[in-house]
């Protein structure tokens, strides 16, 4: 396989990933169903937590589900293309899915002002190993139960999961399909499946999420960060 094909296939999917990631469901849902821009309310963040705080748990969960889905399904589709379409045989799935997160944080459709990437990162994690996603959920909710601060769990949990991903079973088991065959055959044989790739790109994703939470970290230091509190009013989509 030529270098042109290797770079071309990865760049093509990176661009597609970025444009898909740029579809910010918080902004779209708030404008369509609530006739307002979520970026002008509450924390002004275009994410599921701010949606839940301002419009209720149900609509917040809808956005959360959609954000998780866009990275999860893009990872699955890109892995299928990698394994069954020769042109995409050298695609690094974890790399291209990282750009779904980047698109979510810096959406081209919304003046590069998007969400913080936590839910989209969860979709990437779930695609790599659903058990890892469950572990992440347990850690996240344990932190929420203890401190009732969503941002704290959002930027700490990804770094903890990077450590878990180093465990061989997490990145090379039968349910770790997306990360199992990272490169085309000659490279897979030389690097034994490039086991480190999933951990590497999860770490990069964690750094992005840490960056987006810098304002929250400053508030935490000043003890001004918001505690978990959803709207008690009954909210409907229409």
Swiss-Prot record:
GO molecular function annotations of the record: acyl-phosphate glycerol-3-phosphate acyltransferase activity
Cell compartments where the protein resides: Cell membrane
Catalyses which reaction(s): an acyl phosphate + sn-glycerol 3-phosphate = a 1-acyl-sn-glycero-3-phosphate + phosphate
E.C. code: 2.3.1.275
Record pathway: Lipid metabolism; phospholipid metabolism
Membrane spanning residue stretches: 5-25, 61-81, 88-108, 125-145, 149-169, 194-214
Entry keyword annotation includes Protein biosynthesis: no
Keywords: Cell membrane, Lipid biosynthesis, Lipid metabolism, Membrane, Phospholipid biosynthesis, Phospholipid metabolism, Transferase, Transmembrane, Transmembrane helix
Lineage per the UniProt record: Bacteria, Bacillati, Mycoplasmatota, Mycoplasmoidales, Metamycoplasmataceae
Organism: Mycoplasma mobile (strain ATCC 43663 / 163K / NCTC 11711)
Enzyme class of the recorded protein, top EC level: transferase
InterPro entries reported for this sequence: G3P_acylTferase_PlsY (IPR003811)
Name of the molecule in the record: Glycerol-3-phosphate acyltransferase
Membrane topology recorded in Swiss-Prot or TrEMBL: Multi-pass membrane protein
Function: Catalyzes the transfer of an acyl group from acyl-phosphate (acyl-PO(4)) to glycerol-3-phosphate (G3P) to form lysophosphatidic acid (LPA). This enzyme utilizes acyl-phosphate as fatty acyl donor, but not acyl-CoA or acyl-ACP.
GO CC terms of this entry: plasma membrane
Biological-process GO terms, alphabetical: phospholipid biosynthetic process
A Pfam family hit: G3P_acyltransf
Family: Belongs to the PlsY family.
Assembly: Probably interacts with PlsX.
Main location per the UniProt record: membrane
